[in-house]
Amino acid sequence: MPATILKSTASSKTLLIIKFDTNSSRYPFYKKHLLELNSESTFLGLLTKGQADTSITRLNQDDVRLFEKAKTVADRTKDVAYSFSDPILSTQLRTPPPQPTSIRYLYFGTYRIKPWYTSPYPEEYSCAKNLYICESCLKYMNSDHVLQRHKMKCSWSYPPGDEIYRDKNISIFEVDGQRQPIYCQNLCLLAKMFLHSKMLYYDVEPFLFYVLTEFDGQECKVIGYFSKEKRSASDYNVSCILTLPIYQRRGYGVFLIDFSYLLTQVEGKLGSPEKPLSDLGLVTYRSYWKMRVAKALLEITTPISINAIAKSTSMVCDDVISTLESLSVFKYDPLKKKYVLQLKRDELENVYKAWNIKHPQRVNPKLLRWTPYLGEEQISNLLLKENILIPLPQKRLLDNSHHLDSV
């Protein structure tokens, strides 16, 4: 018998004992285990007991204390890194946290700028201490000598797109990401150095880029830009927006926001920036929304409604409602059991005047020379609407009738 089952009764409890026959050939593993335990060596003689001793690997109080200390330091460092908001929509300069990047300085024209974040430039450029970028074509180089030689041959004096707006020395160019992918990719890589949340670098074909420039007498200098999808399923009128740090705190960020809503108004749509917004971006947009809604409430002569305000401002209804609440004019009437607008004209005028004093740089709609982007499907629908094209089923019917007549 390889094993014997014994029963032992003690204090009303039955103990089941299984006794193995170590000499049985049916349980060789058990015999090997007993030999290993009784021998002076372990692991079948490969290691001595001293070498196989694992007692020194057990955690003690010092190990636990050091681990907790290191964990606390790591958590504190992570919290500091995430406590800074993304400056993607703000016109105010904010000192960013230090980032693990090899590029110490960015040379852009006559300016030396310290990058805020890491940008995925090719390795030979991202490992360099300094990065040099041409102000005209945004080509990046890793030495000043290469930049100077490039300037001798670079013939660009403005972005490679259509100039759709000009007011004195301020211009805005519309650049198609599909037609000018290299320029748009360079623009995105430059923007990533100052935008923490930007994830788009190379897939630029589905986007249109609106580049804000300032003419200095010789060429148009890039100030900032915003991008938008050619076909947005969520009615976003801004995907990404940036004012370069050297041009911040001059009102250009609000200028770009105002221009994006002007394009939305020309399209006959309602628009909103892509969510989520950064802290500073939300503050900037809310300030702009207050001005737009206050102006609309002062000018609307027809019965006021959420849809009427949205149509007047080109803002989506959700943004209009949140702005009305921030203006303290959207309140609930417990007697009528519905929401009502309680307008105070003097307060609305103060909001509008204060915003105009702080932001004198405004977009002039009369200077816009632009038509909305039309895709192939939209062009076909437009031509069909104008009876220029014949619908496909009707065209086949005409072709068949012509064939029968010829027979």
From Swiss-Prot:
Catalysis performed (reactions): L-lysyl-[protein] + acetyl-CoA = N(6)-acetyl-L-lysyl-[protein] + CoA + H(+)
Domain MYST-type HAT: 98-372
Major place of residence: cytoplasm
The UniProt record lists the keyword Zinc: yes
Zinc-finger listed as a keyword: yes
Keywords, in A-Z order: Acetylation, Chromatin regulator, Cytoplasm, DNA damage, Metal-binding, Nucleus, Transferase, Zinc, Zinc-finger
Catalytic residues (UniProt): E274 (proton donor/acceptor)
Enzyme kind, highest EC tier: transferase
Single GO term (MF): histone acetyltransferase activity
Modifications the protein undergoes after translation, according to the UniProt entry: Autoacetylation at Lys-198 is required for proper function.
Function comment: Component of the mst2 complex which is a highly specific H3 lysine 14 (H3K14) acetyltransferase that functions together with gcn5 to regulate global levels of H3K14 acetylation (H3K14ac), critical for DNA damage checkpoint activation. Negatively regulates telomere silencing. Telomere silencing is increased due to histone hypoacetylation and/or an increase in the ratio of methylated histones to acetylated histones. Telomeric histone acetylation contributes to normal meiotic progression.
Descriptive protein name: Histone acetyltransferase mst2
This enzyme's EC code(s): 2.3.1.48
Organism: Schizosaccharomyces pombe (strain 972 / ATCC 24843)
One GO location term (cellular component): NuA3a histone acetyltransferase complex
Family listed: Belongs to the MYST (SAS/MOZ) family.
Zn-finger (C2HC MYST-type) residues: 131-156
GO biological process: DNA damage response; heterochromatin boundary formation; heterochromatin formation; regulation of transcription by RNA polymerase II
Binding site for acetyl-CoA: I241, L242, T243, Q248, R249, R250, G251, Y252, G253, V254, S278, S287
UniProt modified residues of type N6-acetyllysine: K198
